[in-house]
UniProtKB/Swiss-Prot annotation:
GO molecular function, one term: zinc ion binding
Sites where a glycan is attached: N389
Residue ranges, compositional bias (Acidic residues): 567-582
Signal peptide start-end: 1-22
Residue positions binding Zn(2+): H267, E270, H399
SUPFAM superfamilies xref list: Zn-dependent exopeptidases
Chief location: other
Organism listed in the record: Aspergillus clavatus (strain ATCC 1007 / CBS 513.65 / DSM 816 / NCTC 3887 / NRRL 1 / QM 1276 / 107)
UniProt keyword terms in alphabetical order: Cell wall biogenesis/degradation, Disulfide bond, Glycoprotein, Metal-binding, Secreted, Signal, Vacuole, Zinc
Name of the encoding gene: ecm14
CDD domains named among the record's database cross-references: M14_CP_A-B_like (cd03860)
One GO biological process term: cell wall organization
Biological role: Inactive carboxypeptidase that may play a role in cell wall organization and biogenesis.
Region of interest (Disordered), ranges: 549-590
Protein's name according to its UniProt entry: Inactive metallocarboxypeptidase ecm14
């Protein structure tokens, strides 16, 4: 305890230095100004704050480091409604006439026509699922789009978001309280609550907060956490990561260390992917030594978590354009910078399709690995496998949105992965775990299928982003990572990329349980004694403030890990049927 207090006090003493050093060279992010002094021993009245002294000390440290004020409220609270009645002029200028439409293609011909029209008009396709395709466009372009579509599609659409500028404005956390409104950048906020709990997950956080948070985790939990870098971005920012794991001092004989890589933020606007990676990291960190499952997984594997592979683009979404997708390196057209990092990998790269159109949202560059950050991660992964005595056995690439679990291949539906049966088996188990966690349904399919085969719809292909050069295919084929998945997180389109902050924790809980099940599946027979996901124990050990409203959600008591993957497609499609939990395993009785 004394050592921990010493570390915290050192951190507090170095607040000024730490915040300045957290800003990358060349960044326009302005560090938060010095906060007003807070007396360490002062405590609010019991009616206002019932936190224990140690909890108050912890929250005070976090407030001091990141300048979080208790007077700040959640951006969606009514107390700030007056300041959010109308987006600022710059938001109206950029997004004022933009809307999001949802189309319902009924045939392969409809899908092909929609994809072709989207390319001709340089439209932003947000998502493709078995039921719909979401497209962002300016209101004045709607007539042009409809003119390029067949009659069957001209009425087969509905408005999804008709106030995009307002939704974008509301998606940012509120600025700090009065007196610092002239500061650039956004500060993290907290909800009005008797307990501040874990402030970091109360809202989306900018890069200038994420990096110091990662340093803090590595400092406080040095026995099993290490902050590392997997590369440097085009603009010179570090691509930070957390490596979690406990290694033997001198293993005899030396065996390759099995590594599971979890990546978020490849596409800058997908904020929920970045928050989810940090949430999963925090749960694994905090529960090591308390949860037998987590302890075993950190002893048997290294877990490398990269919250944002695209730090330049992520910073740009906070500073300029909330809906920016690509990285920020220049292209042949000065006014169209950026490369799609999930189309820049060397395996089955098909950048010829977009080579002449750098303005495309899926522009793959002029050559494989033209995207700096993709190249950096690939070099790091190769170095780990070739020189660092490591084997990457699992890869989870988090994206948004549409709630899908995708497995290789992305480049072609005619190519069959050699481990298809195992990939589908585990993917079905992961989807079931999510449904048991929050009752949300995630579809399972091959990544090549933007719109997939189902019993209710024909097989149509509408997703222009499903192509070669994906990280998913590269890790699976080049590094022989047998269990590689891309997971598209919440939601199914009500908010799209602008998912409100109150969904950070529920989405994080879904993927945390996915990660536990993923790790146990890889352990195989070695996980026999870890045959229960004890949901009640998991909730009991939940760090303070994380559970909140989720405590009211009924959770099953446990089951066998191996059977979590024993799920058929028919079961996945019948989620609305009455189901009864079998207390002896991961199976349902109907």
């Amino acid at each position: 305890m004394r050592l921990l207090l010493s570390v915290l006090l050192v951190l507090v003493a170095s607040v000024g230095v730490g915040l300045v050093s957290a800003v990358p060279a060349g960044s326009s992010i302005t560090p938060p100004p010095p906060i007003e002094p807070i007396h360490l021993l002062s405590a609010p009245s019991p009616s206002q704050d019932s936190r224990r002294p140690w909890t108050r000390l912890r929250d005070w440290v976090i407030e001091s480091i990141w300048g979080i004020s208790k007077s700040c409220s959640h951006p969606h609270s009514s107390s700030h409604s007056s300041s959010r009645d109308r987006p600022p002029s710059q938001a109206l200028a950029r997004y004022g006439s933009d809307v999001v439409l949802r189309f319902y293609p009924g045939s392969a011909q409809d899908a092909e026509a929609l994809a072709e029209a989207s390319e001709i008009l340089f439209l932003d396709v947000w998502a493709s699922t078995p039921e719909f395709v979401d497209i962002r466009l300016a209101e004045e372009v709607i007539s042009s789009l409809l003119g390029l579509l067949p009659d069957s599609l001209r009425t087969a659409y509905t408005p999804l978001i008709d106030d995009l500028a307002e939704m974008i404005h509301a998606s940012y956390p509120t600025r700090r309280s009065a007196g610092v409104g002239d500061q650039s950048g956004f500060m993290p906020t907290v909800r009005q609550s008797a307990q501040l709990g874990d402030l970091f997950f109360r809202d989306y956080q900018p890069l200038s907060v994420i990096v110091p948070w990662m340093r803090l985790m590595a400092s406080m939990f040095s026995s099993h956490v290490e902050k590392i870098s997997v590369g440097v971005s085009y603009e010179g920012r570090e691509i930070p990561a957390l490596r979690l794991g406990v290694r033997e001092a001198d293993p005899e004989p030396a065996r390759p260390r099995k590594t599971i890589l979890i990546v978020g933020g490849s596409h800058a606007r997908e904020w929920i992917s970045t928050s989810t990676v940090t949430y999963v990291a925090y749960q694994l960190i905090a529960r090591y030594g308390k949860s037998p499952e987590v302890t075993r997984l950190l002893e048997d594997y290294d877990w490398v978590l990269v919250p944002t592979l695209n730090p330049d683009g992520y910073a740009y979404t906070w500073e300029s354009d909330r809906l920016w997708r690509k990285n920020r390196q220049p292209t042949s057209l000065r006014f169209c910078p950026g490369i799609d990092l999930d189309r820049a990998w060397a395996f089955e790269w098909d950048g010829e399709r977009t080579r002449t159109n750098p303005c495309s949202e899926t522009y793959a560059g002029d050559a494989p690995f033209d995207g700096t950050e993709a190249q950096q991660l690939a070099q790091w992964a190769l170095a780990q496998t070739q020189s660092a005595n490591a084997t990457i056995v699992g890869f989870l690439d988090l994206h948004a949105y549409s709630q899908q679990i995708l497995y290789p291949y992305s480049y072609s539906c005619s190519a069959v992965p050699p481990t298809l049966e195992s990939l589908e088996e585990l993917a079905m188990g992961l989807a079931k775990v999510i449904r048991l966690t929050t009752h949300e349904v995630y579809d399972v399919t091959s990544a090549c299928e933007g719109i997939t085969v189902s019993k209710s719809t024909p097989h149509v292909q509408t997703n222009p982003g499903s192509s070669g050069g994906s990280a998913l295919d590269w890790f699976y084929h080049q590094l022989h990572t047998n269990y590689a998945y891309q997971i598209k997180l919440r939601d199914r389109g009500s908010y799209g990329f602008l998912l409100p902050a109150e969904y950070i924790v529920p989405t994080g809980r879904e993927i945390y349980n996915v990660v536990l099940t993923f790790g146990k599946f890889l352990l195989g027979d070695a996980a026999a004694h870890l045959d229960h996901l004890d949901w009640e124990a998991a909730m009991a050990t939940e760090p303070e403030g994380v559970v909140e409203a989720q405590q009211t959600l009924h959770q099953p008591e446990g089951g066998e890990v191996a059977a979590a993957a024993d799920q058929t497609e028919d079961e996945n499609e019948n989620e609305d049927e009455d189901e009864e939990w079998d207390e002896h395993g991961w199976e349902f009785r109907r």
